[in-house]
UniProtKB/Swiss-Prot annotation:
Protein name: Maturase K
Entry's family note: Belongs to the intron maturase 2 family. MatK subfamily.
GO biological process: mRNA processing; RNA splicing; tRNA processing
Keyword Plastid among record annotations: yes
Function as written in the Swiss-Prot or TrEMBL entry: Usually encoded in the trnK tRNA gene intron. Probably assists in splicing its own and other chloroplast group II introns.
Species per Swiss-Prot/TrEMBL record: Matthiola incana (Common stock)
Localization annotation: Plastid, Chloroplast
Keyword tRNA processing part of the UniProt annotation: yes
Predominant cellular place of this UniProt entry's protein: plastid
Alphabetical list of InterPro entries matching this protein: Domain_X (IPR024937), Maturase_MatK (IPR002866), Maturase_MatK_N (IPR024942)
Cellular-component GO terms for this entry: chloroplast
Amino acid sequence: MXXXXGYLEFDGAQQQSFLYPLFFREYIYVLAYDHGLNRLNRNRSIFLENADYDKRYSSLIVKRLILRMSEQNRLITSTKDFSQNPFLGHTHLFYYQMISVLFAVIVEIPFSLRLGSSFEGKKLKKSYNLQSIHSIFPFLEDKLSHFNYVLDVLIPYPIHLEILVQTLRYRVKDASSLHFFRFCLYEYCSWKNFDIKKKSIFNPRFFLFLYNSHVCEYESIFFFLRKRSSHLRSTSYEVLFERIFFYGKIQHFFKVFVNNFPAILGLLKDPFIHYVRYRGKCILATKDTPLLMNKWKYYFVNLWQCYFSIWFQPQKANINQLYKANLEFLGYMSSLRLNPLVVRSQMLENSFLIDNVRIKLDSKIPISSIIGSLAKDKFCNVLGHPISKANWTDSSDSDILNRFVRICRNISHYYSGSSKKKILYRIKYILRLCCVKTLARKHKSTVRAFLKRLGSGLLEEFLTGEDQVLSLIFPRSFYASKRFFRVRIWYLDILYLNDLVNHE
């Protein structure tokens, strides 16, 4: 996004107010399609087989789209027109796909510029470790072991399009862009109810931006109250009303806030609260009593219903004890495990046995969901029995083998932090046997005959780089013992979710 700022002809103060003209400039389309903004998401997938519509991009199509956008009536196509002229309908569908990609780039410009200006004058250490999604696990291992309760909340989605438009209005001040944004959203809803071969008009990057904007709005209020909660007993609530007045909310919300929240916020004094958001859920952990968690739950319900006009079901916010609950987090099943320890103490001639309990965060692989994801991609059946990949038999033997080896190594690298490696080895076994069955099917042979002809050296390709390195680091006796299966290693070069997690 820093390179995109170099192409802009006006300063940062004006960019937030004049985003709409960027939709009519060809170089923005070049940046959106040729600058790697979408290429990264395509290349990191290990299951992707077909190219998307990005390859259909051309300068001629861009010029036609800009010409049509200058007259918005030409972009409106009813479902009746689509039935009468399918070619016209698919053409307009492709235009909306291009606009969605452009939206995802343009609307991020004010955010990236604001973020860059906030970092000016500050010395920040650039490290990929800070970007790794697995860096949260060492933090949870250090913090969650001291907590008692966790509030697991499913973040509600806006049910009306105007809520999304109003949320974005606080960030983007360009009225023309907001009107165009509202127009495209309503056109999307009219197309969504019609059969377009189950393809979405807008790309995931655009919807991810809308979702993050919605969540960022509620989190800004939550973090504000969380920061002020430890001072609420000794300070007045005027600062809270200033915050509400800043957002210009209606009088009804003032009454609800005055009647409900003062009593709630008076009991929110707890400096030991940690907040984590992940895939439509937020986790709130504390070491206090369940009363505090009920207060926060009641606060979330009132916040979404009164502030955002979103109906929220209280049963979607569950309060659980960490010792009894399993948290689905980044593809892992995390829970607290009590490890009993017996310590022998010698004092003069007397010895004592002291029973101690060590609390440890245990991260496991959800084998059922992983097998379900493998079954969706035709690597095995629903019971976990490997099957051959019929659509890969047209490739060469080396391509088939390299595909399976890459998938196996990515899974091993991602789930290296599991405390039970036997589940990971079961997944590897499914992929190995699926690879052998695919090659045997290609050569019209049985699995036994194919392995007998090539030998066991074929399966040695699946030995991951982690296994090779760890065999050199740890002693051979430890590497072959059962203790090695409980060694957890978090790699801080993982920036994205594994595809098996995305397919859940």
